[in-house]
């Protein structure tokens, strides 16, 4: 499956995940972190696209991503696909969406008797607060996408799920 984002969105900055790397020869920890990230991207990409552009366009974008993965590199004279314009608008928002889900899932560990909250000696920021701020950043990016999609610059009609436009708080209200 071709992906809207890759691990490079998670190696530095506010979405940094420890040990994530773009190195050609990653360490075992780097490889493990990258595999987790790619697993989340694969798991959530189609749902995100369905929710942010609608089912039909999500399928077309997925097909486009498959095609460009198998094509030879573009030259300066090649025209940019209308799908690429949409992908460019969505990449940062999708990276936030993936990071939100990683934070949510990595904060607890499932056992037979229930969920256990993980403790860490190097915990500096409450995972819940980080989740809230990541979600709300994604919401702001999605609102910008809606403005762009409503303009003449967007080559497609999109149908955004309103849940992706609603900020959250630490009380889940």
For each predicted feature, which ranges?
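Catalytic-loop motifs flanking and including active-site residues across diverse enzymes
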Residues: 94
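Conserved short "hinge" loops at termini or chain/domain junctions
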Residues: 1-91, 105-113, 117, 124-133, ...
